[in-house]
Amino acid sequence: MKDIGIVGYGSYIPKYRIKVEEIAKVWGKDPEAIKKGLVVNEKSVPSPDEDTATIAVEAARNAVKRAGINAEKIGAVYVGSESHPYAVKPTSATVAEAIGATPDLTAADLEFACKAGTAGIQMCMGLVGSGLIEYGMAIGADTAQGAPGDALEYTASAGGAAYIIGNKKDEMIAVFNGTYSYTTDTPDFWRREGQSYPKHGGRFTGEPAYFKHVLNAAKGIMEKMGTTVKDYDYCVFHQPNGKFYIKAAKSLGFTNEQYKYGLLTPYLGNTYSGAVPLGLSNILDHAEEGARILAVSYGSGAGSDAFDITVTERIKEVVDKAPKTLDLLNRKKYIDYAVYVKYRGKIKI
């Protein structure tokens, strides 16, 4: 595979939070049982003036800061999300304009449930590797919704991260050693046009959906690269909740030291398309030169994208040029359920 890597990355997380106890109280549920079952304590909530576009813009600006490049050289911007503000009006064009990348570029909004952001990374890898563009930007961001009283309401959250892909060795903070995808037609989670909330297959979302795809993608990339779990310093997986993430990591043989930096769900919730991009951003915030990372996304419907990544010495030069993911995670203000339903537009008049 040609030399292709990450030259900049940035993240964004809204400051508002709601605790599991606050939601459970309204529905008469046992918060301790929910926290234990999901391994989630609280989740992020976007303010009324935040949506996928504003989250993507903030993450993109932070990525440009770390990359230290002229945004006009970005030849492609892809925003992966299942909560684009408009059905017809691209989020990607708004982001490109906001960072000063227009007009000489291609842009598109992507959808593949929670893995649309990583699909964008693969697309940028292809365009950069072919020489068609100098830099590409891929963003995974969402303001996820869960129906009132549904299990998703305890986890569906907001946040995102952006990655700038390039091929100049002296600019790369991390190199892609390889990528692999695993895709099938698996109807575990869906939402039709015009519907406010998604529907899901309950327990069917586990073994035949999430675990089948994540584990096969992880095994596929390791077979392709000739590696084992011992070759990786860090790993990150899609995290609809903390329980699935930890089970997937342990079933592959990863230790707590390897998977803990990528696990943000307990204090963030499930950011859908932003989940793996945000988890990876936190790993990069902590990683040293030479660290090897296994990243595996998952999108319902269903598919997983896997990446084998090695961090370069340049990481230490850029990590402090933009807010770190944990700094954004720790910048928080708690709200009650009444404010939450107001902010999320759940009160229908």
Swiss-Prot record:
Enzyme class: transferase
Single biological process term from Gene Ontology: farnesyl diphosphate biosynthetic process, mevalonate pathway
Keyword check for Nucleus: no
EC number(s) reported in the record: 2.3.3.10
Listed pathway(s): Metabolic intermediate biosynthesis; (R)-mevalonate biosynthesis; (R)-mevalonate from acetyl-CoA: step 2/3
Reactions mediated catalytically: acetoacetyl-CoA + acetyl-CoA + H2O = (3S)-3-hydroxy-3-methylglutaryl-CoA + CoA + H(+)
Database matches in InterPro entries: ACP_syn_III_C, HMG_CoA_synth_N, HMG_CoA_Synthase, Thiolase-like
Entry keyword Acyltransferase: yes
Active site annotation, chain numbering: 82 (proton donor/acceptor), 114 (acyl-thioester intermediate), 238 (proton donor/acceptor)
Pfam families tied to this protein: ACP_syn_III_C (PF08541), HMG_CoA_synt_N (PF01154)
Binding site for CoA: 203, 243
Annotated GO MF terms: acetyl-CoA C-acetyltransferase activity; hydroxymethylglutaryl-CoA synthase activity
Source species, domain of life: Archaea
Keywords: Acyltransferase, Isoprene biosynthesis, Transferase
Binding site for (3S)-3-hydroxy-3-methylglutaryl-CoA: 30, 114, 205, 238, 247, 270, 300
Role noted for this protein: Catalyzes the condensation of acetyl-CoA with acetoacetyl-CoA to form 3-hydroxy-3-methylglutaryl-CoA (HMG-CoA). Functions in the mevalonate (MVA) pathway leading to isopentenyl diphosphate (IPP), a key precursor for the biosynthesis of isoprenoid compounds that are building blocks of archaeal membrane lipids.
PANTHER family, per the entry: 3-HYDROXY-3-METHYLGLUTARYL COENZYME A SYNTHASE (PTHR43323), HYDROXYMETHYLGLUTARYL-COA SYNTHASE (PTHR43323:SF2)
Family assignment from sequence similarity: Belongs to the thiolase-like superfamily. Archaeal HMG-CoA synthase family.
Subunit structure of this chain's protein: Interacts with acetoacetyl-CoA thiolase that catalyzes the precedent step in the pathway and with a DUF35 protein. The acetoacetyl-CoA thiolase/HMG-CoA synthase complex channels the intermediate via a fused CoA-binding site, which allows for efficient coupling of the endergonic thiolase reaction with the exergonic HMGCS reaction.
Record's protein name: Hydroxymethylglutaryl-CoA synthase
